[in-house]
Amino acid sequence: MKIRFEEMRSPEIGEFIKKDGMVIVPIGACEVHGRHLPVITDTKMAYSAAIDAAEKMSGKIPVSVLPAVWFGYSISILKNWPGTITIRPKVLIDLLYNICQSLIDMGIDKILIVNGHGNNPGVLDVVVRSIGDDFKVFPGVANIFDCWDKGYVMQNRRSKPGGIGHACEIETSVLLHLSEDLVDMSVADSTDIMKSDLQTCPVDWGTSKKRKLYLSTWYLENSTYGGAGDPSCATKEFGKAIHNMTVNGLCEVIEEFYRTQQNLKGRKLNRKCQKF
């Protein structure tokens, strides 16, 4: 069975559906990532991890990966630099809703959205809940950054506090592993290292502090090049470790999600308000 959905012919997709196949919808963004990374960074990270996880799980579960949704919701401050293409949340919700509906209409009821962009989760939560309300099919969302082990990151990072955020040590390291030719390390410096130190809303991802407050931290910083962190100490080895961690985490998600969806099949769900 082919992993890439777009490479299958219609009869092959029909056979995939008969096998109770699961579809992954990768999504990222097209936005500035400093001077040193390509604008497709988030999408590339999500799609590469989804493909590798699907290939790893293909012997256990029939799974196929859609072409990536390469744009997402980006806050307006990122339009200060060339390269950012942002989609209004309501438009992005409708787009993903239609993708899920199309899959459901052809008989696919196991849909996992794999996200690589930090501004997308709120939008994606609305999509999967709306699909559940309207079709009684329950897609899932897996954010690649939720697959990362903070303990490992804290122990192995080379950047100082404030160095892991956007176009940072982690993202630069992963891109060095995936597509080194797209990275320009000659301009990867610490100019945009984050300086805010909030206790309830940590700006650095690689910290033991727990987030108790959501705040758009971009407006706390004064980015020069459209980054937030320190990419200068990125390494291909660290990137490979993070990518493999993401793939393994997604494999766990795929296995449990598929099993959970099978258990939901045939379950009767109340559509009426319960009387007490």
Predicted segments with their positions:
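Extended, histidine- and acidic-residue-enriched regions that form the cofactor-binding/catalytic faces
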Residues: 1-110, 116-276
